[in-house]
Amino acid sequence: MQKIRKGDKVVVLSGKDKGCSGEVIKVNPKENKAFVRGVNMVKRHQRQTQKQEAGIVSKEAPIHLSNLAIADPKDGKPTRVGFRMNVDGNKVRFAKRSGELING
């Protein structure tokens, strides 16, 4: 089970976007990287196709998972993630800062 998943709210811990938060769009577990909406934006030159015209497009670049932390559901501050068994016997994630369950 992964600590950071698609749809999670995360906070960037280091780099040019330190302190910024956003939603995880995509996670690549083999490379230990994730794409976060609106964070780590880079400009790419787009070649013209039949569907879209040429130009410079801003898109998200991947961020290493070690530079991300889950935002605590209670106050939005970065927290570590723990795992515990639910009453149903399912493994669930929880915020170590507040003890709140992380949905997903």
Swiss-Prot record:
Pfam families membership: KOW (PF00467), ribosomal_L24 (PF17136)
Keywords in alphabetical order: Ribonucleoprotein, Ribosomal protein, RNA-binding, rRNA-binding
Protein's UniProt keywords contain Ribosomal protein: yes
Domain of life: Bacteria
SMART domains from the UniProt entry: KOW
Annotated GO biological process: translation
Stored InterPro entries: KOW, Rib_uL2_dom2, Ribosomal_uL24, Ribosomal_uL24_CS, Ribosomal_uL24_KOW, Translation_prot_SH3-like_sf
Family matches, as HAMAP family: Ribosomal_uL24_B (MF_01326_B)
Complex formation: Part of the 50S ribosomal subunit.
Family named by the database record: Belongs to the universal ribosomal protein uL24 family.
Record's protein name: Large ribosomal subunit protein uL24
Native species: Bartonella quintana (strain Toulouse)
Gene encoding the protein: rplX
